[in-house]
UniProtKB/Swiss-Prot annotation:
One of its GO terms (cellular component) is cytosol. Homodimer. Heterotetramer of two MnmE and two MnmG subunits. This is tRNA modification GTPase MnmE. Gene3D superfamilies: P-loop containing nucleotide triphosphate hydrolases, Probable tRNA modification gtpase trme, domain 1, tRNA modification GTPase MnmE domain 2. GO terms for molecular function: GTP binding; GTPase activity; metal ion binding. Transmembrane segments: none annotated. Its main location: cytoplasm.
Amino acid sequence: MKEFDTICAIATPIGEGGVSIIRISGENVLKIASKIFTPRNKYDIESMKTYTMKYGNIVDLENKKEIIDEVILSYMKAPRSYTGENVVEINCHGGVISTNSVLDQVIKAGARLAEPGEFTKRAFLNGRIDLSQAEAVMDIITAKTELSMKAAMIQSKGALSKEINELRGYLLNVLALIEYAVDFTEDDEDIVDDNLILQIKDGIENTNSKIETLLSNADAGKIVRDGLNIVIVGKPNVGKSSLLNALLRENRAIVTDVPGTTRDIIEEYINLDGIPVKITDTAGIRDTEDVVEKIGVEKSKEKIEEADLIILMLDASRYIDEEDSRIINKIKNRKYIVLLNKMDLKDIKIQEEILKNLSNIINISAKTGQGIDILKDEVKKLFFNGEISSESLIISNARHKQALYKSLENCKMALDKINANEYLDLISIYITAAMKALGEITGDELEEDLLNKIFSEFCVGK
């Protein structure tokens, strides 16, 4: 365990509540606590046993008679704590004043206010967790759905770490074979045994296959972690706001028969079978002289560029006109779903021949709810092949994805060099680079500046 000073921070959200927790971590936690904590039974805090709790008061450091708050103090002895250090947690009354008053006394008694993510950083530096597990902690905190929570929990338990360590083991074995082959050629001045080259190639190809398997769900993983950005577009009065209300199951957007009612962007979040989805209802796209509506139309066009998925709504009770065609041309090279709305009406006029060049067409009625479930299933098909597993490892972190691609690229370069009969010393450079890239995921190979940046994005107290 590394030696650090003693740090403290509020570990619970600031605000009114039943209980707040002040976390203290470091060698001197009991010594600091004994200066400001008075147990009801006159117990010697510095001899407190691990995994026990004591009831008492936090008192003013300079005036022991002044009670700051009534608290419960718990102790976890190193190394069996979150940080791997001695940890004390003070459970005080929730509330801004009471919590900050207790924290002030802890600081006066000798602790330093922790930096963002410093507790988790210490857990990493003390070997309690690796970097991928540390990042999973933040993902758990920010999870938007049960699925994203489960994905983060699987990673926090070391599932990704296990895969990465296995891959590094394969590549380490490849390096050992290369070193043996190099020594063999130096000693015997002979051509390397073909079987040895075959073993080296097999080791690299096996690694490539496993990396590609991990990367196969990376795009879906990003959506599980960060959410899917869906933008609803179409002409005015085709039913975009009605669709938003149907998906939200509440009247969030104003719905009228007057074209151009929605002049600004409306953004809402829904849980689509575990997928966090941000749905944006845009202003109807059309040529207009209205200054305010024109701004809304420009915003709509900007949102189209940012979307993961575009939902184009067409009014099935009208003929497709030039404005519809312009919108169709704008989205046809993107991932999209076309909704033919108002299919509950008897007079359907939309021209089928114009739709022949479009795919993913669904008949719906935003008013009655017809086709809404089909729409949800189609979204899942487009991004998850219709199935989302909550039990398997999902690569959801962009940094992990980038490192895996870097490792894969170096492995492929190594194979190319082998097939070109290049020197084995040159091939070992690519294998070493591939191992280094994998080590960036677990933190075994990472610059301190990048480590500091990763942990700085955590909240204070975690």
